[in-house]
Amino acid sequence: MKRRYSILIILLVAIFYRMITFRFKYLLGYDPYFHLAYIEEVNKVGKWINFLTFAGGPWGYQVKLFHPLGLWMTPLYLYKLLKVFGVSLTTTFKITPVIFGVLTVIFLYLSLLKLYDEKRAFFGGFFLAISYGHVFRSMANYYRGDNYMLFWYSVALLGISLALGIKKGKWKYKRLIFYTLPVLASGFSAIFWQAYYPIFAFLLSNALLLAVGAFILKKDKYLLDSIILILSTAFGVLLANYLGGIFGYGMLGYAKWLGKSVAKKLGLEFGYLKDVYLILHLKYLVPISLSFVLVLILLGFLTKDIRIRSLFLGIASFIGIIILFKRFEALKELSTGFGIFKEAPILETQPTSFKDLWAAFSLSFFLTPLFFIRFKKPRVEDFLTLGLIIPSVYMLKTWTRFLFIGSMAIAIMSGIGIVELYEAIKPRLNGKKALATGIITLVILPGVIAGLSFKEVCSLHPEMNEAWERALKWLKNNSNENDVILAWWDWGHFITYYARRSPIAQGGPSVGVALYLLGKLNENWAINLGVDYVIVSYYDFLKFGAILSTANLSKRYNIRGYGLVVLPLRASTGALIFENRGYRAIVRHDKSWNAVIIYNGQMIYPRKLYVEHKEGVQEIKPPESNSNTYLYVNLNYGYAIFMNGNAFNTTLVRLFITPEKPYKLVYSDGGLIKIFKLEHPNVKVERRESNVILNFENGTSLGLYFFLDNGTMVLSKWYNVKGKNEFIVPKVNASVARYVLKRGKKVVDRGVFRLSYN
């Protein structure tokens, strides 16, 4: 196949797979809604802002403590280029992941072309183009930062391949200039994603394995490439540190709690370098790696015997690892994010299961061992590739989050492996058998993998829907700009985007919210956080297991004995039949409502039956009951919820079915989403002419805290407001203000609002 056709096929396939999800009206997942909300706000005011008042309730949210600005700059500046063609900001945001995902595929193809040959480059690029493991974080409508990290690594790999691909001629040493690409790529990756560090680990591993290959294969001239690649990561660290001062540092930066915590664990101090990993890399990993290569160079002069070289190599590697972990024992916790993700019930930080691997890579995962056929007659390029494979495999087994980052290694191994298999078999066959083998191996098998990946991509659907959009837009139009919202954390970014209101939980599990929904914390806890509205939904019941797991992180409460199952409607002829997970609820309405639940052959009659229809929720006491269970039936949307007494008595269920004061139902769509106003002395921000006025009732003291947009507090003061119902906010040179309203010593409301964009 001609090269131009190969790259065209890979390009079209990569675009096609990643644009499948563009058909959706809504974004996929949760985090993209926060990113788009921030970008829209920046575009509206015409400048970069740090302190957000519609996130992180009730305190507000500082973007500088999240990702570097490059994550949001890219789609915004791309939009400024595309808007002349009529492309909207939302559309630009949706397709930005596709652009960088496709570029990653193309750069991988070009890299493999220089390192190997056309066939291996084509299949390596093709497998990455169709890999669901790569597609699902580089597809339209799903915007995530790790897409940029892998893109920049592909740029770095291209630079390495260009440097290694020139064997002789006048470019023999000038070729080393291509190692500036790893410098730039690793440095620039720091401004696009807060967890960009794997690119440095990959490049360092590439360098070390390149040295190992050169040493074992007696290709000692490549040891120079290894040294230069190691040094390129050092210059990349300096560039990343410099850019961090402009665009913001990564998650291990000096101003972030994780950076401070890990620095303390590792015994590191911030100085010129403002990031824990950058310090660790430059001060320890680079010197140890250089020492390792220099030892290999010295040994190369002493012996040419491969067995002796291999022995010394093993000893040197073992000593290097011992030194590193002896100096930094806390590195043993690296795979758990230094302990912060050991128990958190987040799907992305769970160990990878076979089911996850199958969904991400299907049959291509089983082709990966074929890559090692090359090691019958290895080349230094194979060892360089191992430098990506080894850390990728470690990451793959650690977290499902790393399926994407490991997808490039899987694509390379399976793509090259399938060619190795074919070329190993082909000489033993001739005629039609050789042709049939070629068709099966190089056409049908990749086609099956492509089909399985296509099925996975097509199975995706947004968590956001019209019910959420209607509810949150209603909330935006019927609440105050400073109102604080309580909902399960998965919906927090939805609230930020559609309602432009501040949720108290978003982007990560909240133990407090979980305990509140289970009734372990009451409304006084919520009022102390300034909560004005509480959202409960049908979707919360689908997350009930996660709510229990999150609440279990608290050591104060015993979270046991909760039983709840959601039962979809399966049949409606004669009787309503709801069924799921072995439970079957049969509900009839003759002269009155009655219900029975069948489980393991046992007939269970609930203590109470609740039926919601267009007129509202109807409570029915069945004529007979033999259990402390409850059944809620929703006729509007065709589902039922069967629960035991513990689950029924949670705040989540009580609000959804039988709300009481101080909660007032203000919005309901009949069974999907319900919004309650938590009635308490509430502060309302009002703007009259040039004044900002706080309206309230039943308060005795008001605390105001004024901040610059960069998060610096410039003034804090308490005011006596007893007998007053409004307060004119003093004019202070500040951008954001937090408020706390007290009645006596009790906090009755709090929140945050913007003063200006200065």
Swiss-Prot record:
Disulfide bridge partners, by residue number: none
Keyword check for Manganese: yes
Residue intervals on the Extracellular side: 28-92, 142-145, 248-281, 332-352, 401, 455-758
UniProt short sequence motif DXD motif 1, positions renumbered to this chain: 29-31
Pathway as given in its UniProt record: Protein modification; protein glycosylation
Top-level taxon in the UniProt lineage: Archaea
Residue numbers on the Cytoplasmic membrane side: 1-6, 114-120, 167-175, 218-226, 303-310, 374-379, 423-433
GO aspect biological process, one term: protein glycosylation
Swiss-Prot/TrEMBL keywords: Cell membrane, Glycosyltransferase, Magnesium, Manganese, Membrane, Metal-binding, Transferase, Transmembrane, Transmembrane helix
GO molecular function, one term: metal ion binding
Pfam assignment, any one: STT3-PglB_core
Motif (TIXE motif): 340-343
Residues annotated to bind Mn(2+): D31, R144, D146
Note on domains (UniProt): Despite low primary sequence conservation between eukaryotic catalytic subunits and bacterial and archaeal single subunit OSTs (ssOST), structural comparison revealed several common motifs at spatially equivalent positions, like the DXD motif 1 on the external loop 1 and the DXD motif 2 on the external loop 2 involved in binding of the metal ion cofactor and the carboxamide group of the acceptor asparagine, the conserved Glu residue of the TIXE/SVSE motif on the external loop 5 involved in catalysis, as well as the WWDYG and the DK/MI motifs in the globular domain that define the binding pocket for the +2 Ser/Thr of the acceptor sequon.
Known role: Oligosaccharyl transferase (OST) that catalyzes the initial transfer of a defined glycan (ManNAcXyl(2)GlcAMan(2)GalNAc in Pyrococcus) from the lipid carrier dolichol-monophosphate to an asparagine residue within an Asn-X-Ser/Thr consensus motif in nascent polypeptide chains, the first step in protein N-glycosylation.
Name of protein: Dolichyl-phosphooligosaccharide-protein glycotransferase 2
Species per Swiss-Prot/TrEMBL record: Pyrococcus horikoshii (strain ATCC 700860 / DSM 12428 / JCM 9974 / NBRC 100139 / OT-3)
Lineage, top ranks: Archaea, Methanobacteriati, Methanobacteriota, Thermococci, Thermococcales
